[in-house]
């Protein structure tokens, strides 16, 4: 049996073809279409419609959140090969459309004078033709009236041309051209008309009945006696199905196009059906860079050479200050790092000397710090023993002048909390906080005459009646 599956050469050829397709796809321009700020529902829908125009070379499921800044989008666009940003924003008075070229600019800012969504355009048409296969390839760009009207007009034309991949008219496949994007410039009003169309190619030179027979859906001929009635008169067909064709849209096909009757070297009519969206734009300004930079052109503001020179000097001064701050910050970081390293070395040397010095003291017989602390504690205990012996011998506490060192040592220590004793109050049935009774400087004779607390002089039990003594037999 022969070996099943593809051969090694077939696998290699397929891998090389896939690699070429990926390289060709990466070489094409790609775009991000999103909104910035609080735009509202209609502007968000307009951004989705513009994203539909830019398919398939755009991020159709792009989600930009409020916390994402323009720098975040630029950082993401680099690895993905995105070359253009199309941003829609809205203020209290106007709607703006920005076209940015990545990564170095320029940025074109347009004011949206009027716009219509896809649903508005489709609802106004009697018949519309739009399906998913049309968006499998980028649209054909048509620029009209972009003549020698200034450098800003030439820049606009270049920016729009770079939005879509270039087309080689000698090698292009006509079956891949299903849509058309028309941008018309009006020199008088300086406005741009943005229109999006669907392209349909139909054969010419045939009657309405023959065109109906060539369609995929066969017409209803239940009321006809013969097929000649359909071919001769076109009975049963509405007048709206007959569209006027002329020299403006009839051409000879250089190659066969998908559709019945569209053969090579035959006459066919190219029909356009608007599918939206629709915008009327006016250029406001042209800036260097991505959103921030020198204004190269402005439609409403004009500045003299002195003002431009002053702006340029202020910008250069700002850049110099920024570079100076960065250099100072780098020096501070280096200095702190050196100080940290020197402190670490000094600490290690001190720890090393401390270890060496401790061993030398033990060898020479000098008491260490621990031993001196222990001797100090013994002195404190000796002073306490002297005070206690004086109290036992004399019967009262000594004066402060007799033992001044003990007082100073007590003051040096941090005072502790007072001790408390918790006892159960039998009468009330709850815990009570009782403090130790304070000792007063009285003689033992006075304490003996007074007796314990609550005891009477006659040996009774206080306020109550005394219990009789026991009899002694």
Swiss-Prot record:
GO biological process, one term: maturation of LSU-rRNA from tricistronic rRNA transcript (SSU-rRNA, 5.8S rRNA, LSU-rRNA)
Phosphoserine PTM positions: 238, 240, 359
Basic and acidic residues bias: start-end ranges: 335-352, 422-443
InterPro entries: Brix (IPR007109), PPAN-like (IPR045112)
Annotated region described as Disordered, given as residue ranges: 323-473
Stretches assigned to the Brix domain: 29-292
Residue stretches spanning the membrane: none
UniProt keyword terms in alphabetical order: Acetylation, Nucleus, Phosphoprotein
Sequence ranges of Low complexity compositional bias: 324-334
Expression sites by tissue: Widely expressed.
Cell compartment(s), UniProt: Nucleus, Nucleolus
Top-level division of the source organism's lineage: Eukaryota
GO cellular component: nucleolus; nucleus; preribosome, large subunit precursor
Coiled-coil regions, chain positions: none
Annotated Basic residues bias: 409-421, 462-473
Residues modified as N6-acetyllysine: 438
PROSITE patterns per record: BRIX
Comp. bias (Acidic residues): 375-388
Main location: nucleus
Record flagged with keyword Acetylation: yes
GO molecular-function term, one example from the UniProt record: rRNA binding
Function statement: May have a role in cell growth.
Extra remark: A chimeric transcript, characterized by the first third of PPAN exon 12 joined to P2RY11 exon 2, has been detected. It is possibly produced by trans-splicing. The chimeric transcript is widely expressed and can be induced by retinoic acid during the granulocytic differentiation of the HL-60 cell line. The resulting chimeric protein shows a much lower activity than the non-chimeric P2RY11 gene product, but qualitatively indistinguishable.
Protein's name according to its UniProt entry: Suppressor of SWI4 1 homolog
Source organism: Homo sapiens
Gene name in the database record: PPAN
